[in-house]
A protein has these predicted regions:
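Central regulatory/effector-binding core of bacterial HTH transcription factors
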Residues: 1-46
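Flexible hinge/capping segments at coil-to-helix
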Residues: 48-85, 89, 169
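Residues at or immediately flanking beta-strands
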Residues: 12-16, 112-114, 163-165
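Hydrophobic hinge/microswitch elements
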Residues: 21-26, 30-34, 39-40, 102, ...
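Short beta-strand->loop
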Residues: 49-59, 112, 145-161
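Secondary-structure junction motif
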Residues: 83-105
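Well-formed, non-transmembrane alpha-helical positions, independent of function
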Residues: 5, 27-28, 52, 75-78, ...
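A late-sequence structural motif
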Residues: 122, 153-173
Length: 173
């Protein structure tokens, strides 16, 4: 709805939307293939200017019909025993999750990652048909939480907060 409102308010603006992970967006800016990007995560390249757009939280979710015996809250020590589906390398989502793990001396390599996928919608579909847990934005699963098809699993002591930033080349108006 955000883009639809933008186009309604500014019909004279020619807008093309490309989808990619945060690192890909930063590379596209540096190569002058795009003028403005929206990135997640913790990247900070000195030749790019980042402007905060919104704050977000990542959460662990499972499908309500999953056969995983997971309580509403788990400890970080339980994570290696749980099959996971995660975003792909280069995504801000994965970087934020890895940083949160490192605060508990956990590494991604110690976890049972079944699959890395290129987008949140793919993760949600995968969760419908598998017994595993995914890490996604709380904003991206609002409908599923309201509908009761997914449920949040709290990972005790691992807050996964992140920012979305508009990003452009330094010195660009």
């Amino acid at each position: 709805p955000l883009l639809a409102h933008f186009i309604a308010k500014f019909p004279q603006v020619n807008l093309s939307v490309l989808n990619g992970n945060s690192r890909g967006v930063e590379v596209a800016l540096q190569e002058h293939r795009i003028e403005l990007g929206l990135v997640e995560g913790i990247f900070r390249l000195p030749n790019l200017k980042y402007t905060l757009f919104l704050q977000d939280e990542l959460v662990a979710v499972v499908h309500v019909n999953s056969k995983l015996n997971i309580q509403e809250e788990i400890t970080p020590a339980e994570l290696p025993n749980i099959p996971l589906v995660l975003r792909e390398r280069g995504s801000g989502t994965l970087d934020v999750f890895e940083r949160a793990l490192s605060q508990h001396n956990l590494k991604l390599s110690s976890l049972n990652v079944l699959m890395y996928l290129g987008g949140t919608e793919s993760i949600k579909l995968f969760l419908e048909h598998t017994d595993c847990m995914g890490i996604v934005s709380i904003r991206s699963v609002h409908k599923e939480l309201v509908a009761g098809t997914l449920r949040v699993v709290e990972i005790k002591g691992i807050p996964m907060l992140r920012e979305f930033n508009f990003v452009k080349l330094q010195g660009q108006e």
